[in-house]
Regions:
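Compact, glycine-rich, soluble single-domain proteins
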Residues: 17-175
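C-terminal motif of bacterial Sec signal peptides marking the signal peptidase cleavage site
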Residues: 13-15
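Sec-dependent signal peptide recognition
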Residues: 2-9
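Residue-level signal for mature regions of secreted extracellular proteins and peptides
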Residues: 9-10, 163
Length: 175
């Protein structure tokens, strides 16, 4: 009986410490987050970004916290559906960010340049917005992006590309 118990214990230990299965070995280590194209049309040209989307309240709460870097053409979009007055802070955010608060017509309502890492001071446009876009700090100034410039994303930003998303933002042309 002791021999049988010892074999069972040994078998359980071997099973728990075995190497990953073939399926585990073939799975990607960590899939990169899916991105969404965004185009900003400014007086200085058209600028494309491929950004992550914070859809859920949990994703929006975390945002770009703990990131050590952000690509020049990267960022994060925080869609607000329905539009609402959004307030952001930089708690646990390691890098400066530009925050672009976007009107429902696609124009930039407010641009906070180079928001200070770790700051707990709220940043807001003070009005309901359709989205907030966070870019690498200083990027808006580098590209001449300013309040009043227009954004579109998803299939409306790059209509010639096949985009599988339900997040298409197609503002009406400026009058």
């Amino acid at each position: 009986m002791n021999r049988l118990a010892a074999l069972l214990v040994f078998g359980l230990i071997a099973a728990c410490s075995s190497s990953p299965s073939a399926a585990d070995k073939d799975a990607p280590a960590r899939a990169a987050p899916a991105t969404l194209p965004i185009v900003i049309r400014s007086a200085k040209g058209t600028h494309r970004f491929d950004v992550e989307v914070a859809r859920t309240p949990q994703e929006q709460e975390k945002g770009l916290m703990f990131r050590k870097e952000l690509a020049a053409d990267g960022g994060m979009l925080f869609p607000m559906n329905p539009p609402r007055t959004a307030s952001f802070w930089m708690k646990d955010t390691l890098i400066p960010l530009d925050m672009l608060f976007v009107h429902t017509d696609g124009t930039i309502a407010f641009l906070q340049a180079n928001a200070q890492p770790y700051s707990r001071v709220p940043v807001s446009a003070g009005i309901p917005v359709a989205a907030v876009l966070e870019l690498r700090g200083g990027r808006a100034a580098e590209l001449g992006i300013a309040e009043g410039d227009r954004l579109a994303w998803g299939g409306c930003a790059v209509s010639q590309e096949k985009i599988a998303t339900d997040l298409n933002f197609c503002p009406s042309p400026a009058n």
